[in-house]
Amino acid sequence: MNPESKLSQRIAEERAKFFQNMKHNGIEDEVFLNWFWNNKYAACEGALSLSVAMMYEGWKGAKKFSLRASAFLDNKILT
């Protein structure tokens, strides 16, 4: 196996382990996990579980706020 294939395989294994660990800890949003892996985790390669949890709570809050704001604006436009 060439070195690039070994590296790709190792990254895929680490990513799978990261996703499994996060889902085990209750973080199940695939969009968030993909975003976090691509933008944060892969760059740091460390124990960022606390950061993940805090960012995820912010992510959920922003999602709820976005949905509420959208519903509010839709209601204002309709009335």
From Swiss-Prot:
InterPro entries to which the protein is assigned, alphabetical: DUF5490
Pfam families: DUF5490 (PF17593)
Protein known as: Uncharacterized 9.2 kDa protein in Gp55-nrdG intergenic region
Organism, as annotated: Enterobacteria phage T4
